UniProtKB/Swiss-Prot annotation:
PANTHER family attached to this UniProt entry: MITOCHONDRIAL DNA REPAIR PROTEIN RECA HOMOLOG-RELATED, RECA
CDD domains named in the record: RecA
Residue segments, region Disordered: 345-367
Superkingdom in the source lineage: Bacteria
GO cellular component: cytosol
Lineage: Bacteria, Pseudomonadati, Pseudomonadota, Betaproteobacteria, Burkholderiales
Family according to the record: Belongs to the RecA family.
Name under which the protein is recorded: Protein RecA
UniProt cross-references to PROSITE patterns, sorted A to Z: RECA_1, RECA_2, RECA_3
HAMAP family linked: RecA
Keyword Nucleotide-binding (UniProt): yes
Length: 367
């Protein structure tokens, strides 16, 4: 009886092995693999956003490489600042970055203040949406670019709209453009381990009585293809006396395919400086009991580092090694890995398995 039961199973194994042999012959080795062989499942490589609180809210310590990310929010909420900081962090790891400026509004002086090496940054100011997405596709396929930012989806104007008259009605043209581009881009992005960030704007749906009337531009394709979607909002102002020197900012992770979603991060964006990273380290460090706070004094390892948040922040700014040490302890306490250097990014499909797979043995038997 047992032999009869095992016979169909053996036939199925041989049929599967033959099918796998045909697939590998037609599409190349690694087209289909078992998950347990370790050739597919890998630790997600990430790059910091420049905000410790947001890195922690993302669950893996930053934005994932080899994925599409969407950052959206109202005007002057910090979208471009966040992406420029991410570029600066990627450059610190030795990565190559590109900025596709469809809005033709990049402030290079501000980018430099945020720590970006302009001589190493690739920049494009395309004339049409098709041109912008073709440039993005070419850069991704090259495998030589680690991070691409497109600013913004709303500015990706289809060629037909530019060449037409002002009053022409062209419904759904931009949505179709985005849908086609993302279908083409997604596979290449994953193979080359490139992080692609789309900045998007908010529009209001007309006639919505119940629910959220807000929506993003460019149709629904980006919502589906994005592994991470961040909703960034300005919640208040930071003042020094009567002068406004920055914004209080809230970011909600509204979609996350690599960690639990719906977490929030609160941080400060200072004008001309970007995210107050030292301020975040103090706040999150005191929450994790790594930095001691007694009255107005902040202390670390029994040594006082400043009276009042401003003094403590300046102390850490002058001592980046100490700030990094505290940040790594905060990350470790919450189970988020430290950010390391970029590894060699050979396409996943071509990486050899550590052990010979079961399919390989079966294929030998078939042959």
């Amino acid at each position: 009886m047992d032999d009869k039961k095992n016979a169909p199973s053996s036939d199925k194994s041989k049929a599967l092995a033959a099918a796998l042999a045909q697939i590998e012959k037609q599409f190349g080795k690694g087209s289909v693999m078992r998950m347990e062989d370790g050739a597919v499942v890998e630790e997600v490589q990430v790059v910091s956003t420049g905000s410790l609180g947001l890195d922690l809210a993302l669950g893996v310590g930053g934005l994932p490489r080899g994925r599409v990310v969407e950052i959206y929010g109202p005007e002057s909420s910090g979208k471009t600042t966040l992406t420029l900081q991410t570029i600066a962090e990627m450059q610190k790891l030795g990565g190559t970055c590109a900025f596709i400026d469809a809005e033709h509004a990049l402030d290079v002086t501000y980018a430099q203040k945020l720590g970006i090496n302009l001589s190493e940054l690739l920049i494009s100011q395309p004339d049409t949406g098709e041109q912008a997405l073709e440039i993005c596709d070419a850069l991704v396929r090259s495998g030589g670019v680690d991070l691409i930012v497109i600013d913004s989806v709303a500015a990706l104007t289809p060629r037909a709209e530019i060449e037409g008259d002002m009053g022409d009605s062209l419904p759904g043209l931009q949505a179709r453009l985005m849908s086609q581009a993302l279908r083409k881009l997604t596979g290449s992005i994953n193979r080359t381990n490139t992080l692609v960030i789309f900045i998007n704007q908010i529009r209001m749906k007309i006639g919505v009585m119940f629910g959220n009337p807000e929506t993003t531009t460019g149709g629904n394709a980006l919502k589906f293809y994005a592994s991470v979607r961040l909703d960034i909002r300005r919640t208040g102002s930071i003042k020094s006396g009567d002068e406004v020197i920055g914004n209080e900012t809230k970011v909600k992770v509204v979609k996350n395919k690599i960690a639990p979603p719906f977490k929030e991060a609160h941080f400060e964006i200072l004008y001309g400086e970007g995210t107050s990273r030292e301020g975040e380290i103090l706040d999150l460090g005191s929450d994790a009991k790594i930095v001691e706070k007694s009255g107005a004094w902040y202390s670390y390892n029994g040594e006082r580092i400043g009276q009042g948040k401003d003094n403590a922040r300046n102390y850490l700014k002058e001592r980046p090694e100490l700030a990094r040490e505290i940040e790594n302890k905060v990350r470790a306490s919450l189970g988020v890995p430290e950010l390391g250097a970029i590894k060699s990014d050979e396409p996943v499909a071509k990486k050899a398995s550590a052990k010979e797979s079961k399919e390989a043995k079966e294929l030998k038997e078939v042959e």
